[in-house]
A protein has these predicted regions:
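Gly/Pro- and small hydrophobic-enriched strand-loop and loop-to-helix capping segments
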Residues: 236-250
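Short, Lys/Arg-enriched N-terminal segments with co-localized hydrophobic residues
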Residues: 9-20
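Conserved alpha/beta-domain cores
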Residues: 18-219, 224-226, 232-234, 248-249
Length: 250
């Protein structure tokens, strides 16, 4: 039986005289995180099945930004291996020891990257999801050559054209992706977006999917705790989920 089935049995066993009992308040933090992880995986599988997608084609990126290593260990103990961090320095402080203790970790940079942190980012992360401007792309290309280490790269698209948000504007995506590929020799694997918080996410997910299709890009990082099932419907290959697993951040 898989993890999702085990969670369903666990929930069923908590029913007493026809009433649902909450597991989370009665169990320790490890059990809470484990149950939440499985709950998200159930939701991902359900969404994939509902829209004729293979569940194994969609990866859960557990967003661990602002959470201490002790909390992350509980997700690792529960079997999660793919994580997302916003800041290079925070990742450098937390993850070397965790990598020593747990095999198979894949670490994604999901926050904006400063060019003076490109060397550390290439050294630290397996995936950089926020390639968002020529200066950063050039710095990453130089570090890939210098370090002989090539993290997977995704271009961040600012689908809402928000002035305060990072990302290439949709109308500039063609030229930027071409620059990354043809001028810098970067292997762009896919696209990433963060829709505006005050708008419906579906048009932004659909736009990202259209741009990816135009460029033959297979990977789409979109969808967070509140809308990952919708993102799966519209083609996400990676969903970035934090609060639904770890709870609210301090």
């Amino acid at each position: 039986m898989d993890e999702c089935g085990l969670l369903i049995l666990k929930i069923a066993s908590a029913r007493v005289e026809g009433h649902e009992m909450s597991l989370l308040p009665e169990e320790g933090e490890l059990q809470q995180i484990s149950a939440r992880l499985l709950g998200v995986r159930i939701g991902m599988r359900r969404a994939a099945n509902d829209f004729d997608r293979a569940p194994e084609s969609i990866q859960l990126v557990c967003v661990s930004k602002n959470f201490p290593a002790a909390t992350i260990r509980q997700a690792l103990d529960a079997g999660q291996r793919v994580f997302g961090e916003n800041r290079v320095q925070e990742a450098m402080a937390k993850w070397p020891e965790l990598r020593q203790d747990f095999a198979g970790i894949e670490l994604h940079l999901i926050g904006q990257l400063q060019s003076n942190k490109a060397a550390e980012a290439v050294a630290t992360f397996d995936v950089i999801e926020t390639v968002d401007r020529p200066k950063i792309a050039s710095a990453i290309a130089a570090e890939i050559k210098a370090q002989r280490k090539a993290p997977k790269l995704l271009v961040q698209i600012n689908t809402g054209a928000e002035t305060q948000k990072a990302g290439i504007l949709p109308g500039e995506a063609d030229a930027f992706i071409g620059y990354c590929r043809n001028e810098l020799g970067l292997d762009i694997a896919g696209l990433m977006c963060i829709p505006p918080v005050d708008q419906q996410a579906s048009p932004h997910f659909a736009l990202l999917a259209r741009i990816a299709k135009q460029h033959g890009l297979a990977e789409l990082s979109m969808g967070m705790s509140a809308d990952y099932e919708l993102a799966i419907q519209l083609g996400a290959t990676h969903v970035r989920v934090g609060s639904a697993i770890f709870g609210s951040r301090s």
